Curated annotation (Swiss-Prot):
Cellular localization per UniProt: Cytoplasm
Highest rank taxon of the organism: Bacteria
PANTHER family: HAD SUPERFAMILY HYDROLASE-LIKE, TYPE 3, PHOSPHOSERINE PHOSPHATASE
Gene3D superfamilies (UniProt xref): HAD superfamily/HAD-like, Putative mannosyl-3-phosphoglycerate phosphatase, domain 2
Residue ranges the record marks as coiled coil: none
Name this polypeptide is given: Mannosyl-3-phosphoglycerate phosphatase
Catalytic residues of the enzyme: 13
Gene Ontology molecular function terms on file: magnesium ion binding; mannosyl-3-phosphoglycerate phosphatase activity
Organism whose genome encodes this protein: Escherichia coli O7:K1 (strain IAI39 / ExPEC)
Length: 271
């Protein structure tokens, strides 16, 4: 067990973890967010969402000014005080959103794979798919280094699609509800390691890390954490880690923000 007093970074997924998958409510986690804020412990949001979406949510959660990881690690939004770092305010890994769109359109036209991207529809349709407001749905379309899509083809064709993407230096990642295409060099783990190294360089000491997530695309993040909370989720595949030592990994009984709170309660029991 470790202490809330020691240098610590908390990395958290959003949908299905800190936010309820259906209502987007986060109130069960609010007391812990306040406690971490009072202890000057950064809560670093890490999601498949766009940086525009996440900056809005970051402000809503009272976490503004902190770094965040967007688009499954393809985009790192730097902390406000990191203005001297090259690339400020955002670091983007791999090829751009526009370049990925070109690849996908070519594959769809020439090899007849069936899928619908967020670029194929308007914000009203995305609002129906997600339950977001129109204004929030519009933020989901502001990708910089990935493409979000709904797969509408067979499992056999998906395997062929993934192989073609890999040949082209891209990866296909499953989220809680949607699929994401991004550069093969990008990932939540690489982005988290970069942020950890930056905090270490600035403070002179490596912080202890705790990660929370509920979906398969959170596994790379949780693998590089010192401690991990696997929040009970909706995805049938779940999250599986190479090292699930109970001293390091806790699987919650509750879902969403209640599971988030349960995970923090587990690793920081009341004194």
């Amino acid at each position: 067990m470790f202490s809330i007093q020691q240098p610590l970074l908390v990395f958290s997924d959003l949908d299905g973890t800190l936010l309820d998958s259906h209502s987007y409510d986060w109130q069960p986690a609010a007391p812990w967010l306040s406690r971490l804020h009072e202890a000057n412990i950064p809560v670093i949001l890490c999601s498949s969402k766009t940086s525009a979406e996440m900056l809005y949510l970051q402000k809503m959660l009272g976490l503004q000014g902190l770094p965040l990881i967007a688009e499954n690690g393809a985009v790192i939004q730097l902390a406000e005080q990191w203005q001297d770092i090259d690339g400020f305010p955002r670091i983007i890994s791999g090829i751009s959103h526009g370049e990925i769109c070109q690849v996908l359109n070519t594959l769809r036209e020439k090899e007849h794979f069936k899928f619908t991207t967020f670029d194929d529809v308007d914000d009203a349709t995305i609002a129906e798919w997600t339950g977001l407001s129109r204004s929030q749905a519009a933020l989901t379309q502001l990708h910089e280094a990935s493409v979000t899509l709904i797969w509408r083809d067979s499992d056999e064709h998906m395997a062929q699609f993934i192989a073609r993407l890999n040949e082209l230096g891209l990866q296909f990642m499953q989220g809680a509800r949607f699929w994401h295409v991004l550069d093969a060099s990008a990932g939540k783990d690489q982005a988290a390691n970069w942020i950890i190294a930056t905090y270490q360089q600035l403070s002179g000491r490596r912080p202890t890390t705790l990660g929370l997530g509920d979906g398969p695309n959170d596994a790379p993040l949780l693998e590089v954490m010192d401690y991990a909370v696997i929040v009970k989720g909706l995805n049938r595949e779940g999250v599986h880690l190479h090292d699930e030592d109970p001293a390091r990994v806790w699987r919650t009984q509750r879902e969403g923000p209640e599971g988030w709170r349960e995970g923090l309660d587990h690793f920081f029991p009341a004194r």
